[in-house]
Amino acid sequence: MSFPQLGYPQYLTAGQGAVYGGERPGVLAAAAAAAAAAGRPTGAELGSCPTAAVTSVLGMYASPYSSPNYSAFLPYTTDLTLFSQMGSQYELKDNPGVHPATFAAHTTPGYYPYGQFQYGDPGRPKNATRESTSTLKAWLNEHRKNPYPTKGEKIMLAIITKMTLTQVSTWFANARRRLKKENKVTWGAMGKEDDNIFGSDNEGDHEKNEDDEEIDLESIDIDKIDDNDGEQSNEEEDEKLDHFRHGEKVSLKKESEVMIPSSDGLKPKDSLSLGKECSDTSNTRIVSPGGQGNIQAPPHSKPKIWSLAETATSPDGALKSSPPPSQANHTSPQMQHPAFLPSHGLYTCQIGKFHNWTNGAFLTQSSLINMRSLLGVNPHHAAHHNHHHLQAHQQSTLLATNLGSLSSDRTPERTSPKHSDRENLPRTESPPQLKPSFQAVREKTFSQQEGTSRILTALPSA
């Protein structure tokens, strides 16, 4: 072997047969060819060089080197099939027999969907295939009228189809949606009630998801967690709203019970509709001017709403009528002052009757009651007063006929400003046989001097 790159070709060419013993002829032939190409003398030309010179130069490398035994390894001269087949060991399905029996190839952990579960995880449910859904379809065909399985039936179907309970419920929801779209089949409330009676786990799910898109059975387990969180929050809000509404109903019921007294519980609705206004005036007692005791006010049959327009347009004679002043001495001491009456009306003065209002010093307590305006007065109270005025006027006419001969009693009667109002009243309120005598006596006894004194007494007060 020659090493021209090292610069020692002449020392290795001499005695090559002796050095290497002719064990590797291929190597020697290659060395001779390299020396001829380089233009250097071969071993035959340098035969005169002794072997001692080579030994002295090489030193420890002059001893022959015996090649070890490489029989355990693959020979270099043969073609190695390992390198040509390195890329095919990953194509297990196409070339299953590329490796020899003695070659141990690394096997990758391959899992095939031939078993019960996929990917070797027993916790992962099986996908919805035709074999698994055929059982669900058979059940659905048998229960077309009520396609809502109970919880027990869903558990049974889940065991048979090796699916989860959520997947079975979702499959039935999708199937009902498809039936509605294809055949436009609608199921009544009976099916839903039966489903709720037996405790189905998707109560409210079919009503909520019937019109939505179909749900993927693969991701239903993950989506169910999010839906449960949303449903719990919605249920809490609904419970708070129902509790608030229930509290409002209870408070309204208590208020209505407080407003209606217990004594009015047996009355009809039309009497209860009057409310608190009727309860204030239903027990009002009116004292007669003759002092004959208290008279219970008759109940008003029909309520009437008083308004400002009605009060302004009503005639004065219908609103007030006064008894004669001669009844001042016979009034009962139980008559209260007008300010202490139950209905707090407004005391107003009509402009057309201003001179009557200014002559208030000549009025009695009963006439002051008649001067009150009906503005703001309870309708029952006003009706009772009108009835009282009618009775008092009839009694006053009877008493006036008995005392008609006494001019002293008639003189203060003429000085009262309310006497002129009584003259304007219609004559139908008093008995017809008493009017001519009362009118005749009054006209005969009235003189010019008394009229003059009446006018003079009215002027200073005006």
Curated annotation (Swiss-Prot):
Function: Acts partially redundantly with other irx members in neural patterning. Required for formation of the posterior forebrain, midbrain, hindbrain, and to a lesser extent, spinal cord. Acts early in neural plate development to induce expression of some but not all proneural genes, and specify a neural precursor state. Also up-regulates repressors that prevent neuronal differentiation. Patterns the neuroectoderm in both the anterior/posterior and dorsal/ventral axes.
Regions of compositional bias (Basic and acidic residues) in chain numbering: 240-257, 410-426
Keywords from the UniProt entry: Activator, Developmental protein, Differentiation, DNA-binding, Homeobox, Neurogenesis, Nucleus, Repressor, Transcription, Transcription regulation
Subcellular location(s) of the protein: Nucleus
Organism: Xenopus laevis
Stored SMART domains: HOX, IRO
DNA-binding region coordinates: 121-183
Protein name: Iroquois-class homeodomain protein irx-1-B
Entry similarity comment: Belongs to the TALE/IRO homeobox family.
GO BP terms, alphabetized: brain development; cell development; cell fate specification; dorsal/ventral pattern formation; maintenance of kidney identity; mesoderm development; midbrain-hindbrain boundary development; negative regulation of BMP signaling pathway
